Amino acid sequence: MAPEASPERSCSLHTCPLEDPTGAPVPPPTVSTLQAIDPTSPLTAGHFAFPRAPQDYQEGSSLLGLGDQASLCAHVSNLSTSIDTSQHDGVWKQPSVQRHVVSVRQERTFRMPKSYSHMIADWPVAVIVGCLAFIFLCTLAGLLGSPPLDFSEPLLGFEPRDTEIGRRLEVWKAMQALTGPKNLLSLSPDPEMNSSSLLSTLSPAAWGRAEESVVRTKRMVGPVEVKEEENFFCGRPEKSHAKLVFVSTSGGSLWNLQAIHSMCRIEQEQIRSHISFGALCQRSAANECCPSWSLGNYLAVLSNRSSCQDTTQADTDRTLALLRFCATFYHRGVLVPACVGSSQDKPPFCAQVPAKCTGSNVVYEFLHYLLDRDFLSPQTADYQVPSLKFALLFLPIIKTSSLLDIYLDGLGDPIKVSDNYTSISGMDLGLKPRLLKYYLAEDTMYPLIALVVIFFGMSLYLRSLFITFMSLLGVLGSLMVAYFLYHVAFRMAYFPFVNLAALLLLSGVCVNYTLIFLDMWRLSRGQVPSGGMPHRVGRTMHHFGYLLLVSGLTTSAAFYGSYLSRLPAVRCFALFMGTAVLVHMGLTLLWLPATVVLHERYLAHGCVAQAHGQRGGSDPLRLLLALHRRIRIFRKIISILSRLLFQRLLPCGVIKFRYIWICWFAALAAGGAYIGGVSPRLQLPILLPLGGQFFRSSHPFERFDAEYRQQFLFEDLPPNEGGNLPVVLVWGILPVDTSDPLDPRTNSSVVSDPDFSPSSPEAQEWLLALCHGAQNQSFFGDQPEGWPTLCLVEALQQWMESPSCGRLGPDLCCGQSEFPWAPQLYLHCLKMMALEQSPDGTRDLGLRFDTHGNLAALVLKFQTNLPYSTEYGPVHHFYTEISRWLSTEMSKAPPGLNQGWFTSNLELYSLQHSLSTEPAVVLGLALALAFATLLLSTWNVPLSLFSVAAVAGTVLLTVGLLVLLEWQLNTAEALFLSASVGLSVDLTINYCISYHLCPHPDRLSRVAFSLRQISRATAMTTGVLFASGVIMLPSTILLYRKLGIIVMMVKFLGCGFASFFFQSLCCFFGPEKNCGQILWPCAHLPWDAGTEDPDEKGRAGPPGFSEHYELQPLARRRSPSFDTSTATSKLSHRPSILSEDLQIHDGSCCLQHAQAPVSPRDLLLDHQTVFSQCPALQTSSPYKQAGPTPQTWIRQDSQGQKTEPLQALPEGPAHCPKSKVEELPDGLCSSASTLEGLSVSDDTCASEHSVRVPDSVGTSPEVMNGTGHPILERGQLNGKRDTLWLALKETIYDPNMPNSHHSSLSWKGRGGPGDISPVMLPNSQPDLPDVWLRRPSTYTSGYSS
């Protein structure tokens, strides 16, 4: 303390009244550390008063920062006396009582921080404000410099771009959109002769939808004559009408009167009674809503009833007999619309059909549209009572988004659309895109609830709402900065909807970082009890900063690996998510430690003080206090169970059963690889993303597409209407996609081939040969009418010889029989043929003319005999066969036609081809980038390989489980699989870095060290993310559900592989010391501390005196008394710390001078570090008081004058300092052994045979020579325990001191400046001397636990 005359001065956290009875002025302070003072010094206890320190400082719960305006300092005596000096005397003397002299000095209000830790500790508010200002500026620039978010088309971007097939499809779509009268390309050479059409004014996307509508209409059966009885309906049902599928509630047949009446009743109550139905329905000539095409209405028409409800059972029986009779002709293919009616120009085969089957359209439409394909099929026609499983109802409403109100008010409720007989199980209302947008906004609550669960679990673990809130703010800030970089720095124009998933995924990364940092922060309090806030920040960030950099870089690299995909949405997500992880890593380095320092300094003490200060008051207050006490009791129980699980059971279980864990997880990974890649493997999609699955499988919209659509015969494609794959050959336009591959909203334009020349004689001959060669191929099929023929040259020859050649007047082309023709004549004749056969510019002859009337391109088509399929295999065979044939032909083409290419209906195949090849490549690249990042960060090959093996096992098992869950490899699944590496890599890196930074050289101790240090935070992270995934399962949107499943599965499996598989691999093959390490010059590893060369140690400080005492090697046989002696030693009055973290010490046994730190601060750092890492050997049986245990030492100053014997400071077993402000988590004690949990097991506590027992350093006080120097002597062990390692982490033990006093003062005596006194190892035999070991003053940069 300072002299009494010093005025009272205030620190930032404490008020320190200082008094000086002598009135002497305060000498200027030199350092800011606590140091023991020699009693003969002028600054001894007699000169100072020791007032009561504040409560929080006494308990060791808070650390003063070096940046306080009034710092707590200590004076350093200039005397040369020390403990080292006293050891030169011939007699051992009791050391003096350690007394701390504290003074207060005034410092400058503002000063520049000396280092990163000083900046965080001294200016936490400034750091946080600076980060907030940076986030605000980036957010403002990102919002102002980018277009507003548009999620109107959430599935946009899931079609492959920038692939060979994709480029050709984009160019072909652009050519179709730009072809027409008054357009860039035309079918006629003279645009003035063509009238404008609707298609020329449509955009490419709108034109495609219009063409699709035309194609769908053409596939419908053509109109036929309507009979008088059919005037009940408004025409015939079309595919464009809204459809409902009815099933039986009881599982029986729908062909009964009760079920038919039930369907009519549900339609009337839930659809026709809706207020919007009248405005949407199709109306008859009488301006009334047309009746529905339903089972009951067709039955009423055949039975001459006025409505569905008037039908009887006899009507159903009579109609069933008629349908049974006519079904035979329908399935034979002779009952077709052409045979229906009374017209005379029927096909000849219609004579086979009886008149009662063709007298009306009702019978045909009954069988073709309303009944499922199995009802009255040839296989079930002989059944006495056929079963109708599904019945279709066509509403007189065109499929449109206007049906949303009807769906939400009635059809969307399963209870309203079902009764005791029937229920609506499937729907096709054309509402999937519109309903997707609705549910995307409606189900957003599930991801938000998942976020609440994540941060609520974090707050329970941290016990701080402030840190939790700041962590959430850091996540949001990181996303906003990433959004700024995404748009402004990377120039990305498209922001897909899937990028919003980054909020949930980045929150999981934040939880992992925050929990680990807080564990290390609490741990550093016990390791650095008096080092100040800057040293505590530096101590924590020494380990956490390394872990954060490695984890952040590896995770972002894994996400960036997905950029290799050709799906624009996946590439945009990879870029945004990888950038967000990097930004969050950078902000965490500043934001998180500053937040914790701010909480530690201003919030933690105040909150606890208020809680302890309110002891009385009203009944509600007492009730709250009672509840608080119960919660604390429950929390203590959870803490005890957590300590038992993560500090004892988990390390023991991993190390003891490591053989089982390796085999089990390797088998799981191999099984996942086989299931996902061989059989049954992930199935490719059979629908395009716009027609794919949006909602969960039980949704009626999805059930109609997946189950019911193929149950009705009208959905089948007729064999002569687009059933086969066409081939489109293009010359004159290069297959170059000019659109932005990362923006699916952009459309490509056409790029002309400058070398295109189809008029040369060689080109004419080659085109004719190409026609004949294609006709001889096995894939060439029958050509439909009106198609542009592949044989353009033959068509021109036929036209020249036909009478129609001269229809436009005399021309040079007519009658030309010489071949090949002159180039100018050839081009002129092609133009004349186009004008004659397509005067309005609507017939496609395969010619494309530009605006000047010149031939710009050739587009020739032919039909193959290969049927279109949604399966990948047949279409892949078609594509490879056509590509091989065309490549061969193009190799023979003349220079003007050698740039030709082909395309077809390959949209689905393009997606399937990308999904069949890219996920494996993307996952492999992500794993390779993760390995490279780990290797560059740790420079350790085995650890990098083991980490990547654990991540790969997680991904393989995830894929296998997804196959068992019947997932298809669709676009969403490809996105989540590409992100699985980034989601699972951080948990493994936690253990990898903790293992790498462990100061212990042997692999078992390092495995236990990493498990005890990281496992609880890893388990908590996995738990909260698993819970968040469960929360998202009830969502209607399939994207949310699958995101929840992926998060659950990847995090759970990743935790298992990291905790058991990776650690078990390290138990077997983990690197020891420098094994597998890529060494660089001047490299210093954590476990190299204490093994420096004596000469190097001599240069570290002034010379001193040091003795080395060598113990006898331990036996390799384990004693039966292992467990008994361990248990009794814990119950004895002397400290015993079980450990297997033996530090290898290669020092020699000769006399050499010990090194003292050059400054008290260095002394403090060295002393604390060594005490937590330098082990020794100790006997373990119950201690005997009869042994010769010295109680006092006699100290001697430099002049040889003896001082009074002083009692040594006692110190009990090492433990965590218990604080009234905040309890440390169990298992985070700095002095606890890394394998303390293994001491209870007789099987797992044995050391490896490969680990040698090191030499220890010691000096015996009983054996001294005449000059006061110790005599080296072998120590004795009683042999009761073999290969047991004990860590020296205590000061001198005093048996007269109570155990409670030992516990309360153990942390205070540890690490004090100048405390390098020897430590006694009591022998269990009363007739043998104890062993005394000298504490070396060696500083190591390792991080101890």
UniProtKB/Swiss-Prot annotation:
Stretches the record annotates as Disordered: 1-28, 1251-1271, 1295-1345
Modified residues (Omega-N-methylarginine): R1310
Localization annotation: Membrane
Annotated TM spans: 125-145, 440-460, 465-485, 497-517, 544-564, 572-592, 659-679, 919-939, 945-965, 974-994, 1019-1039, 1043-1063
Record field: compositional bias (Polar residues): 1297-1306
A Pfam family it matches: Sterol-sensing
Protein family membership: Belongs to the dispatched family.
Protein name from the UniProt record: Protein dispatched homolog 2
Organism: Mus musculus (Mouse)
Organism classification: Eukaryota, Metazoa, Chordata, Craniata, Vertebrata
